Amino acid sequence: MGVANDSSPEYQWMSPHRLSDTVILGDCLYFNNIMSQLDLHQNWAPSVRLLNYFKNFNKETLLKIEENDYINSSFFQQKDKRFYPINDDFYHISTGGYGIVFKIDNYVVKFVFEATKLYSPMETTAEFTVPKFLYNNLKGDEKKLIVCAWAMGLNYKLTFLHTLYKRVLHMLLLLIQTMDGQELSLRYSSKVFLKAFNERKDSIKFVKLLSHFYPAVINSNINVINYFNRMFHFFEHEKRTNYEYERGNIIIFPLALYSADKVDTELAIKLGFKSLVQYIKFIFLQMALLYIKIYELPCCDNFLHADLKPDNILLFDSNEPIIIHLKDKKFVFNERIKSALNDFDFSQVAGIINKKIKNNFKVKHNWYYDFHFFVHTLLKTYPEIEKDIEFSTALEEFIMCTKTDCDKYRLKVSILHPISFLEKFIMRDIFSDWINGGN
């Protein structure tokens, strides 16, 4: 078996490890360790049998369960202080438009359903190959500002996730109906169900019921109760009415401390920043330096992330200073955290052309497209920026747009400012805390 050189753009077309019709990129040990804890073939009895099962319960029997002392604290929502992961389970932490994300131990596992009729499995590898290519070609500390997946499995059968979701949804429907003394039915209104679930999810009595019924009815080490409403919105969205939840990719990442958008004033101070605005300058500067260094690489001036925003920037511990040299300056970061760019699903660089982005963009773009969107999302996420007149005024230079050339913060026209625009921008006194170590 050959070894692929992942510093080459052609790496994405190679298949280092094959498993029948599946492919594993990266570290097989990490991947197989995670896969050994998943049952991709688990299925359940027909839903009508679940309905008959719940006919054995009524409001009185549920009250007796609620009176028990036993409670599995992993069924609280993760933002609840009472939440505690008592088992080595997969805990749902996020569902977005393109992936369902779980945490297990110190790993993050992302499942992505792919449109197999539009792309071959090897055309969906950008989330692994682009950051790996950049990491291996960048020479300085800037490479530390990239999140690289440890492993990626292509073309795996993922129907179990949709089946699991439906099983949990039906359990919750029947449980809530029993609590309310209603006639049992698997029919539901999205608005009514979400209202009922959101009203109960933080209740200790409801968590006691989940502690009883989830193991009995679901019997899985995948806990989707956390942020279940996000999963509901994903699977129930009208645009996926006829979607086939058949195959996709499984990606394994290191576990971050937070995503950048989760930091508020209190947490920024706790992390060692003088203010929330200083923290925002910190992540902006690190991302700007990363882009500048990427654009210095041969043939990489076509790099696009295509979704640069605070929740796609992750924060990790930083145990040593990060020093990045640019012309006659050096930028020194002594903070105990670092920011790192994540989620390269729609990215492209050098010879790695991403069909997803190619099909979506009608005009040519460069780094400015990403930073135009980034600044818009920063200002939306952090209105506190306006209190710093100098910083907010400077950021306005990235969003001098109108409704005709910008839609939902995304440029519709081609504006190809040279990367020197960004280089000059970060040399301003706004970032003096880090230029030459703050001296």
Swiss-Prot record:
| Subcellular locations according to the entry | Host endoplasmic reticulum; Host endoplasmic reticulum-Golgi intermediate compartment
The record ties this protein, via InterPro entries, to: Poxvirus_ser/thr_kinase (IPR008790), Prot_kinase_dom (IPR000719), Ser/Thr_kinase_AS (IPR008271)
What up-regulates or down-regulates this gene?
Expressed in the late phase of the viral replicative cycle.
Recorded catalytic reaction(s): these are:
L-seryl-[protein] + ATP = O-phospho-L-seryl-[protein] + ADP + H(+); L-threonyl-[protein] + ATP = O-phospho-L-threonyl-[protein] + ADP + H(+)
- From which lineage does this chain's organism come? Viruses, Varidnaviria, Bamfordvirae, Nucleocytoviricota, Pokkesviricetes
Q: Where in the numbering of this chain does the Protein kinase domain appear?
A: 87-439
Keywords annotated in UniProt: ATP-binding, Host endoplasmic reticulum, Kinase, Late protein, Nucleotide-binding, Phosphoprotein, Serine/threonine-protein kinase, Transferase
Q: What does UniProt say on post-translational modification here?
A: Phosphorylated in vivo. Autophosphorylated in vitro.
Q: Which organism is it from?
A: Vaccinia virus (strain Ankara) (VACV)
Is the keyword NADP assigned to this protein?
no
What family name appears in the similarity comment?
Belongs to the protein kinase superfamily. Ser/Thr protein kinase family. Poxviruses subfamily.
Primary localization class, coarse: host cell
Chloroplast listed as a keyword:
no
Which residues participate in ATP binding? I93, S94, T95, G96, G97, Y98, G99, I100, V101, K117
Active site at which residues?
D307 (proton acceptor)
Membrane-traversing stretches: none
GO CC terms of this entry: host cell endoplasmic reticulum; host cell endoplasmic reticulum-Golgi intermediate compartment
> What is the name of this protein?
Serine/threonine-protein kinase 2
Q: What does this protein do?
A: Essential serine-protein kinase involved in the early stage of virion morphogenesis.
* MF terms (GO), sorted A to Z: ATP binding; protein serine kinase activity; protein serine/threonine kinase activity
A single Pfam family it belongs to is Pox_ser-thr_kin
